[in-house]
Amino acid sequence: MLGFSFFLFLLMRPRRMQGSQEPCSVIYLGRDNLEKNHDKSLKEWLKTHLIVPPMELISRILHSLFPTSRLPSPDLLGPGLAFFILAALLHTGHSAKVLQTASSAPSPILALLLYTALIPAAAYVSVCIAGSTLSLMETISLMGYASYGHILAMGIPVLFHQEESEIFFFWCLTVFGGLSSLRIILVLLVSVRIPAARLVVCSLVATLHLLSLVFLHFVYMHTTFVYGGN
């Protein structure tokens, strides 16, 4: 009996593998496999959401302005690229404003971070309440690609009219902001399961999307608008 107990003690005692500082015993069997599987799943997730072929990325950006209900596999590369383009655009417009009007506005990067965090969060909460089939990643990808409508609606007036014509901006708002909002609405109409909630959710998300565009334009791109002024 004593010999059998001693044999069990030797079997269960942690041993150091050759060339390793980590103890190894029968208790730790499968630990390396779990770590490898975790690393593999993390790499697959990063590869799926952060690596997009260039032509596929261009196609997704173009399709973000087409009114279609088809939603491609979600990724973060397109929304991330839109974030940096918007940051550069807002900083350019903010630096061109008069000093008195620019100093009253919050930092462009702060406003952009709040926009990036709050708009997708509000959209996701709304679609969850309405019983939508969209996941969080799909919602972030949908709203992120819709930001290219913001880029075109604010960037084209700067290139052609230097923000001198408000009519031209509102025309761009109607075209590019309207197309991106229409695509959001079509995707939500397909994904929301509760018929009575479709109108409310689509109206809310599209309104937030367009109001954020109007806010960013007047606060950071308009040359004479004073944020918080009387």
Go through each PLM region and give its residues.
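Sequence-level detector for tyrosine residue identity
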Residues: Y28, Y115, Y124, Y145-Y148, ...
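Short hydrophobic/aromatic-rich motifs at helix boundaries and adjacent loops
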Residues: L34, K97, I156-P157
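Residue-identity detector for glutamine
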Residues: Q18-Q21, Q100, Q162
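Selected alpha-helical membrane-embedding segments in polytopic membrane proteins
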Residues: H38-L136
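Hydrophobic alpha-helical transmembrane segments and adjacent short intramembrane/lumenal linkers
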Residues: I129-F225
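Terminal intrinsically disordered, low-complexity, charge-rich regions
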Residues: M1-F4, L8-P54
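Compositionally biased, intrinsically disordered low-complexity segments enriched
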Residues: S20-P23, G93, L211, V219
